[in-house]
């Protein structure tokens, strides 16, 4: 892939402009014309390097309850388990990982769900013939920022910024805007034109509301998401660490400061699960990933840790917020 395409990909992951002609804005940064930029992006999309470009919303701030969940499933039951888990509209990620707890997925339920998160997990556990399950909600988030360093120029460590959010009450228009902005944008000169026409609003109204949603932390960012493997990031390791409770926050922040870490959380422990810090590491090779994790261990002085590489991706797609599919799924069990 050309250096210019790598620069474009990194920029679109970090700062996609929200204006009437975002591709024009971006093209000026790279000293190419708008049509050439759109053509390059279309080629990257066709090659399946770009997954989608859309708003990324905060599940919790929208009132949804969510958790990471792990199942221990016998090899003969994996196919059945995957079918059951993937059928839930609140499952956005589902992976096979190298561990006795071998199926790992994220699950979200709506604010008005008739079933609790635990009840939903139990239904999926029974459908999956899982032997054991653990529910690992976020107790503290240290970092969430999926940005693949396609340029090779990003520093090994980064400073984390603490953000304060203002409270807003979602209006019916906000909900309609969220429904629209969560979709992949069309690759054309005015990608937001269809939205303002459907909602019968102006560009100014759309971008003002989007800014409000960002200031409230409801919309984390508007960005391009890549297919990690297609973009050359073939090693996807979930590193898990046993940290002393009194130092968990300090050490979580230290793990999160590594640029190769996209997500870093504090989660609960159980008799059958002793690790409380989770840090997702993305690298081009397992050797590179292992070296990063070794460096993380050295800096934190943590000795009890392991890494769970994903060996198969069963599902990776955005949750469709305010979708009727959640209610439809629940109605089978109520």
Show where each model-derived region lies:
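A compositional/biophysical signature of low hydrophobicity enriched in polar/charged and small residues
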Residues: 1-334
């Amino acid at each position: 892939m050309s250096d210019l395409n790598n620069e474009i990909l990194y920029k679109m992951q970090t700062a996609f402009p929200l204006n009437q002609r975002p591709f024009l804005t971006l093209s000026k940064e790279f000293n190419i014309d708008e049509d050439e930029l759109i053509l390059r992006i279309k080629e990257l999309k066709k090659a399946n390097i770009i997954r989608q470009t859309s708003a990324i919303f905060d599940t919790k701030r929208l009132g949804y309850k969510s958790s990471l969940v792990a199942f221990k499933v016998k090899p003969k039951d994996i196919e059945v388990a995957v079918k059951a888990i993937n059928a839930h509209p609140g499952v956005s990620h589902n992976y096979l990982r190298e561990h006795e707890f071998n199926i790992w997925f994220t699950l979200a339920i709506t604010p008005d769900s008739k079933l609790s998160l635990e009840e939903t997990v139990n239904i999926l556990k029974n459908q999956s013939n899982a032997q054991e399950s653990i529910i690992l909600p976020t107790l503290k988030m240290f970092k969430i920022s999926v940005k693949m360093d396609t340029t090779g120029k990003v520093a090994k460590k980064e400073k984390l910024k603490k953000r304060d959010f203002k409270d807003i009450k979602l209006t019916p228009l906000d909900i309609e805007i969220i429904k629209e902005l969560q979709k992949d944008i069309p690759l054309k000169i005015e990608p937001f034109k269809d939205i303002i026409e459907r909602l019968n609003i102006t560009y100014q109204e759309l971008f003002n509301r989007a800014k409000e949603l960002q200031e409230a932390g409801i919309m984390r960012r508007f960005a391009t998401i890549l297919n990690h493997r297609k973009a050359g990031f073939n090693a996807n390791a979930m590193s898990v660490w046993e940290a002393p409770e009194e130092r968990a926050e300090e050490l979580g922040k230290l793990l999160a400061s590594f640029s190769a870490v996209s997500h870093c959380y504090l989660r609960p422990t159980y008799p059958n699960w002793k690790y409380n810090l989770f840090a997702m590491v993305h690298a081009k090779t397992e050797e590179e990933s292992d070296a990063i994790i070794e460096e993380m261990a050295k800096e934190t002085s943590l000795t009890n840790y392991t890494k769970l590489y994903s060996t198969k991706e069963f599902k990776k797609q955005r949750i469709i917020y305010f979708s009727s599919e959640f209610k439809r799924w629940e109605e089978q069990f109520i």
